[in-house]
Amino acid sequence: MLEQMGIAAKQASYKLAQLSSREKNRVLEKIADELEAQSESILNANAQDVADARANGLSEAMLDRLALTPARLKGIADDVRQVCNLADPVGQVIDGGVLDSGLRLERRRVPLGVIGVIYEARPNVTVDVASLCLKTGNAVILRGGKETCRTNAATVAVIQDALKSCGLPAGAVQAIDNPDRALVSEMLRMDKYIDMLIPRGGAGLHKLCREQSTIPVITGGIGVCHIYVDESAEIAEALKVIVNAKTQRPSTCNTVETLLVNKNIADSFLPALSKQMAESSVTLHADVAALAQLQAGPAKVVAVKAEEYDDEFLSLDLNVKIVSDLDDAIAHIREHGTQHSDAILTRDMRNAQRFVNEVDSSAVYVNASTRFTDGGQFGLGAEVAVSTQKLHARGPMGLEALTTYKWIGIGDYTIRA
């Protein structure tokens, strides 16, 4: 089965690579329109997936990731339209010039070819990834989680209908609908057809891909994100940022998981934090230094376990640790962070600059929420992933991250001396 999918994707990629920006945008507009026109079939499939997931004991955080609503589906369609409005990087000349030999040389952006994406219970990923791949002239093979099998099948069927109505092969966007995990291992060895692989899931999936894939892998998406509250932070303003970073949508990878509080502000900050977190129904996992003071407040508090500093909760849980100073905070982030998104809240711009320079994450913020690490927020349109590695792409992966380049030399029967 996968062999045939690979052949179809590779053949489709050749055709996609030749499309003009106008032709690609016409396809995307058709997909957006069809997602809305056929929303009932997608929402019905999603309702079945959610019901099965709830019956199987999936957590509320995971159910939130899985669930589609009419408003969310409308937002997904609008994201596709936003991709239409983005500049097409394919064909851009990055640099070039004329050599001493007279050869005119240029470096031009081109599609990667075929992208493989493995992801879990996030039905929006199906459309986000497909739209970005099509905009950049790439074919894509999707392997979603078993929890979203009906939703993904219904969504891909809509996309393929739109492709065919525009005269393009259905092989441009395909999904592996068989939940057999052995197919993941088989997919990881499809280097004959797939040019880049992007896993979007937990640490286990990333480890599997790194160890078994014969395809170049872009890893990321695991977000143990931190906010450091410096001693000069404005408490009321800091709490607004923390509430946003923790509660706006707890199941996302850019949600804060650990709060580091400077010891010199702890006495005034912790009572205010407890009150605010109680109102937001957040459970605090406190270290020894913060435990007694937080237990005196209204928030639910438990003693933090050492391993929880490495956990991506994806829920209304927040670690709280007292640190001696900025050095202590940076050391903690280096040990426990995942190089995703980290922030400092401070009025001391020297400390802010040190934090920016010394915290080696894909996104670093000063006096802002970690929730901004998102392709849409960055103006990139829908994102294919958030890369936490350093090669090829880093941070939210938009259109340019799905391209490579080729060197083009134009001469007049020019030969090398």
Curated annotation (Swiss-Prot):
Compartment(s) of residence: Cytoplasm
Family: Belongs to the gamma-glutamyl phosphate reductase family.
Pfam families: Aldedh
Any one biological process term the GO annotation gives: L-proline biosynthetic process
InterPro entries, sorted: Ald_DH/histidinol_DH, Ald_DH_C, Ald_DH_N, Aldehyde_DH_dom, G-glutamylP_reductase_CS, Glu-5-SA_DH, GPR_dom
Record-given protein name: Gamma-glutamyl phosphate reductase
Location, primary (coarse class): cytoplasm
Residues spanning the signal sequence: none
EC code: 1.2.1.41
Keyword hit for Acetylation: no
